[in-house]
Amino acid sequence: VPQAGRAKRSAVVLCNGEPPSRTLLARAVKHADLFVCADGGANTARQHDVMPDLVIGDLDSVSAGTLRWCRGTRIVRVRRQDNTDLEKALDHLLTKGVGNVLILGAAGGRLDMTLGNLSVLWNYTSRMTITCAGDGWRAHPVVGTLVLAARPKSTVSLVPFGSCSGITLGGLQYPLRNARMSIGEIGVSNVAVRARVSVTVKRGRMLVLVDENRRRSTS
C-alpha cells in the first residue's frame, strides 16, 4: 500500500471516440481518484451509467439529455478552439496534481481526432504518466525508458512520430539495440516473449502499442 501523500493522484479521461466496454470503464474508474469526461465522452458514460466527476470541453458534442443526466456533476465549458477537448481535460488535471492518467475513447471515430489525440500526448509526458487504452489494447508515449507488463505472444508495435534514435528493446522477439527509426519505417507486429517488455528511446517521440487481441494482420 503506498504511503499517504506519496502516491500520485490518478484519473480516467473518457473521450468521444470508440466507446470502451462498460466492464473496462467501470473497472478503470473504480481504481481512479477522478473520472473526467472530455465533452462527448459523457454520452458514453451515460450509456454505461457510470457518473463522471467532471465534464469539460467546448460542449459541442455532449447531448442535452446527457447534460440533464449529469445534473450534480461539475460541468466546465472552455470555449477556446485552439486545443482539443482531451487537452482541456489534461490541462485541468494538471491543476489538480494528477500524475497518472488513463485515457479511454481516444481512438476510433473521426480519424483526424484520433491522430490529434495521439499527437498531443508528448506535450504532457514530462508532467504526468499517460496511457491510452481500449478493450484489449494499450498505447504508451515513450519518454526515456518504458517498462510495461505484456501478456506473452501479445503484439507490440512501435510507431515513431518523426525521427527516433537510441532505440533499445527488451523482452521482444525482434530486439533492437541503439537503433534508429523514422516515420514510415516498419516497427509493427513485434511479439512479446516475456511478461515484462522494455523500450528505450533516447531521442524522438515513439508510441508503443500493445495489442492482446488475436486478430489477423491487415497487411
Label each PLM-derived region with a short phrase.
Residues A32, P52, G72-T73, V98, ...:
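Short, well-ordered alpha-helix to beta-strand connector turns
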Residues L111-W122:
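Short Gly/Thr/Asp-enriched flexible loops that form oxyanion-binding sites at enzyme active sites
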Residues W122-R151, V156:
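Class I SAM-dependent methyltransferase SAM-binding "motif I" and its flanking Rossmann-like core
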Residues V1-W69:
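N-terminal beta-strand-loop-alpha-helix module at the start
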Residues I75-K96:
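Short phosphate-binding loop-to-helix
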Residues L14, V36-D39, G57, R77, ...:
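General beta-strand structural signal in soluble alpha/beta enzymes
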Residues V142-S219:
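Long, charged alpha-helical interface segments
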